[in-house]
Amino acid sequence: MAKGRKPTTMNRSDRYLGSYTYGDSHGNSVTDELELGEEDIWSPAVIHDDTTENEESYGTWNLRATLGKNGRVGGLSLAFEGSLVAPPSSSPMIVQKIHGGGGEGEEDRRKLASSAPVNVPDWSKIYRVDSVESIHELDDEDDEDEESGMMPPHEYLAKSQARRSRKIGGGGASVFDGVGRTLKGRELRRVRDAIWSQTGFYG
């Protein structure tokens, strides 16, 4: 190519990337060629084969070509099917009713409206939660034990610990007493027990 020779036609990628640079010496034909048209940006799948570029027929989509293999159309495609075949006009668009009265549509609605039976689990059996009556029976037994008279403190503490472990579920209190049998661990345990008994945590 000669130095002064400029390309007369450019492809789209050259126009997008701007690989050609021009000076001020060329005319409107080159600048028109550099401008992007609507067809460069928007490339529809199928355009009607009308050669006239009037606004009514340009860029009209062919709905039949965009159908799937099974040929089904639903939703907005079905609603606007009649309006896309005819050229657009200045009159307002009338949306077609998708489901007509009677026929298969009502049967589908009946099927959707009914619900299957639901199995509701019995959580008291799953989590082994005692009923309200059994909790009251346990409280009555505890009251009978306390009414029996005076008992030594170590027996009272053992019974109260057993009662607490039954209410909680056998795990006992979830407070770490301390590592080993240190004085600090024992003292904190006594403080903890005193605070819990005064605040009513033990019951």
Curated annotation (Swiss-Prot):
Residues 1-33 are annotated as: Disordered. Pfam families: Senescence_reg. This is Protein S40-6. PANTHER family: EMB|CAB72159.1 (PTHR46525), SENESCENCE REGULATOR S40 (PTHR46525:SF18). Belongs to the senescence regulator S40 family. The gene is S40-6. Disulfide bonds: none annotated. It comes from Arabidopsis thaliana (Mouse-ear cress). It is found in: Cytoplasm. GO terms for biological process: leaf senescence. GO terms for cellular component: cytoplasm. Keywords: Cytoplasm. It comes from the Eukaryota.
